[in-house]
Amino acid sequence: MDHTLHLHVPFESARLADIAARALAPDPLLRPEELSVSFASDGASLNIKLAAIDARVLRVATNSIFEALKTVVETADELDF
């Protein structure tokens, strides 16, 4: 796939990064032939790798991941993780 994006999202702790990776990973991709996504925690960072067939698919996927990540962070804040 021609378009890639690697994100490194810092968290306050390795535990929160791991929770975020596990919370985001289960969502199945609707078109795996157009997009691949991986989530991995590395210490207190969440590493996200995306690869897409074109810029539009990458942009839409990135927006979706940021929305989901926002929900994970807000939930962790509310639950005082």
Curated annotation (Swiss-Prot):
Keyword Cytoplasm found: no
Coiled coil ranges: none
S-S bonds: none
GO cellular component terms given for this protein: chromosome, telomeric region; EKC/KEOPS complex; nucleus
A Pfam family recorded for this sequence: Pcc1
Keyword Nucleotide-binding listed: no
Example GO BP: tRNA processing
Membrane-crossing residue ranges in chain numbering: none
Family in the record: Belongs to the CTAG/PCC1 family.
Function: Component of the EKC/KEOPS complex that is required for the formation of a threonylcarbamoyl group on adenosine at position 37 (t(6)A37) in tRNAs that read codons beginning with adenine. The complex is probably involved in the transfer of the threonylcarbamoyl moiety of threonylcarbamoyl-AMP (TC-AMP) to the N6 group of A37. PCC1 functions as a dimerization module for the complex. The EKC/KEOPS complex also promotes both telomere uncapping and telomere elongation. The complex is required for efficient recruitment of transcriptional coactivators.
PANTHER family: EKC/KEOPS COMPLEX SUBUNIT PCC1 FAMILY MEMBER, EKC_KEOPS COMPLEX SUBUNIT LAGE3
Subunit composition and interactions: Component of the EKC/KEOPS complex composed of at least BUD32, CGI121, GON7, KAE1 and PCC1; the whole complex dimerizes.
Entry protein name: EKC/KEOPS complex subunit PCC1
Origin species: Eremothecium gossypii (strain ATCC 10895 / CBS 109.51 / FGSC 9923 / NRRL Y-1056) (Yeast)
Gene, per the UniProt record: PCC1
